[in-house]
Every structure is written in C-alpha cells, then in structure tokens.
Amino acid sequence: WLKAFPEAKIPQTEADIKSKNRTPTVLYNGMLHPLIGMTMKGVIWYQGEDNWNRAHTYADMFTRLINGWRAEWKQGDFPFYYCQIAPYDYGIITEKGKEVINSAYLREAQAKVEHRVANSGMAVLLDAGMEKGIHPAKKQVAGERLALLALTKTYGVEGVNGESPYYKSIEIKNDTVVVSFERANMWISGKNCFESKNFQVAGEDKVFYPAKAWIERSNCLLYTSDAADE
C-alpha cells in the first residue's frame, strides 16, 4: 500500500539507507510480520515523532496501516487504540516556520482516523507533553488512557470513561463563543458549571489571548476574551 505515497521511498541500495531503523518496511518485516497468524485481541500503538511533518498524508497512511494489519491477520476488525502525539516545540529541531512545524496539524489528522476506522480509538495526550523534551516522561498517563479505552470499548466495563470529548460545532454570540462537543456526557457534569483557565481565543488577527471559560450543561464550553478582535 506504500505505492500510494511516493514520499515513503524504499532505498534501492545499502548506500541509500540513511537510518536503517527508519527505512520503510524494516520494522514491519523484522518485528511484526513474524507474529502474523497468532491470536490477536487488539493493538495499542504509541505514535512516534518521525511523522510530525507529514500531516497531509498521515490520515490516509495510518488508515491503510490499520486495514492492512487486519487483512494480514484475518481475524476481523480487532480493536486498534493509539496515542495522540504529545505537544513539543519542534522549532528546536528545525528552522521551518510555524505554519509547517505546528504538530496540531498531525493531531487533527490523527483525530480523523478515529472517525474513519471502525473499532478504533485515540488516547488524548495534549496535556502530557514537554515543550523542551521530545520524549515526554508521562508514559503512565498514556498507558492509563489506552487502558481506559480498552476497558470501555473492548471489555464493556460500565462506569469507565475511556473516550475524550470530540469537537462538534461552534456558535458565536456577541463576545461569547459556544463550543459544543460529542462524547461529553461523562466528561462534564450536567448539574454544575465550573470555570476553566485552559483556553485561549483569537480574532481575525490570529493573536491569542487568555479566555474566561465555563463548562456548562452536558457538552458545551463557553469562553470570551475582551482583548480578541472580532
């Protein structure tokens, strides 16, 4: 399936190999293919950093990877749970502009896969990264959230919230933006409202300012900022 992605080139000679462990097909043939045929309950996948600048092809490539593994095993659509790439300042390792190195584009592509591929799920790690550390230390957080996905979606454990809220829509009312989410019933209490300081808002000038935010009802975030332009 790599033929559909010309940038994933397989070196023709050993001299063309810059990094052997990153050569397309090497990890698959060396570590995965020998396991084909064994009983498969499901997969948990920790996304590495090497794809941070491939957001434009990531959703298609990752979808094909999952479908390809399932086809090889011939054991149906077994669960495939994966980690969102954690935040990191990629400006440390490249001189490209923020429009290119913004890993938010990759996280957006990862979110698309969850909605394209049946029986899959993404563990959100937006709060578990390190600005100056490309390998974040909070691996336990990743493990716990993958486990919650499995408990919720595979083992049917009740009372466990394994899925993160997913953006649905926005509505602008004067100086207030109402952001609605799917899958937020267990994330937000319908009985109480509470304030959050984890949001920013920007106007057409794309300059972000801290926003006053409230979690309200079962699936909405309301936030405002006096500093942002319309």
Q: Which residue ranges define each predicted feature?
A:
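Mature catalytic domains of secreted/periplasmic carbohydrate-active enzymes
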Residues: S103-L106, G162, I215
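Immunoglobulin-like IPT/TIG beta-sandwich domains and homologous Ig-like subdomains
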Residues: Y209-A211, S225
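Conserved small/polar residues in nucleotide/adenosyl-binding loops
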Residues: Y223-E230
